[in-house]
């Protein structure tokens, strides 16, 4: 068994069948984070052998803390792919709450453009911590950074051996927190990254019938 498969042991398996080639959803993920978020989704997609998933790392220079820019960038990339005749089936943006004054506008625009948005409060690191333990009480970004450092994190890099296979536990822990009812004002802690993970797992365990 390969190292990749061992990391996802116990999770849903990809249904591979010989013969007729299956077509899978083509998914675009545009991540606001400079390193952590793209690294997580690139690795997760690789473990799923999700070759039709494209993860985009946005250059933070000139972007600032503006989730609307993430949404607009995703729409731009989707339009280009559509013009090239190979449209995405799903488009996702991954952003943090942090101190985003423009989050409401970004959510409105994402809804108008039919782009899904995964928001974490206070930041994406809460989703990472849920792979290790339950956390339902209010928490800030600095505390999350300290907790993850105890688990081998160094700066924004995800350590080798991170338990990606614990994504189901992370989803369950996210569900125990107050649910996101108003997208631009999610409770702390919370994360709708679980919805994105669910979309990826579903797309790559249940091939689209052609």
Language model regions located:
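Conserved beta-strand elements of the Class I
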Residues: 28-30
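Glycine-rich, highly charged phosphate/nucleotide-binding loops
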Residues: 70-80
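Short acidic, Gly/Ser-rich segments with clustered Asp/Glu that frequently serve as metal-coordination loops
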Residues: 33-36
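C-terminal accessory helical subdomains adjacent to catalytic cores in phosphodiester-
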Residues: 1-9, 13-26, 38, 42-60, ...
């Amino acid at each position: 068994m390969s190292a990749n498969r061992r990391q996802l042991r116990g999770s849903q398996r990809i249904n591979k069948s010989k013969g007729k080639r299956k077509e899978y959803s083509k998914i675009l993920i545009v991540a606001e984070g400079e390193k952590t978020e793209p690294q997580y989704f690139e690795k997760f997609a690789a473990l799923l052998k999700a070759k039709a998933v494209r993860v985009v790392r946005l250059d933070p220079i000139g972007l600032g803390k503006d989730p609307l820019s993430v949404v607009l960038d995703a729409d731009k990339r989707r339009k280009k792919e559509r013009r090239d005749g190979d449209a995405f089936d799903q488009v996702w943006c991954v952003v943090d709450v942090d101190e985003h004054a423009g989050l409401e506008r970004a959510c409105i625009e994402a809804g108008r453009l039919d782009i899904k948005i995964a928001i974490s409060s206070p930041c994406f690191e809460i989703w990472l911590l849920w792979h290790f333990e339950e956390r339902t009480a209010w928490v800030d970004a600095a505390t999350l950074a300290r907790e993850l450092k105890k688990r081998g994190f160094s700066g924004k890099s995800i350590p080798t051996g991170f338990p990606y296979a614990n994504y189901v536990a992370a989803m369950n822990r996210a569900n125990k927190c107050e649910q996101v009812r108003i997208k631009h004002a999610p409770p702390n802690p919370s994360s709708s990254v679980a919805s994105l993970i669910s979309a990826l797992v579903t797309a790559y365990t249940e091939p689209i019938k052609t």
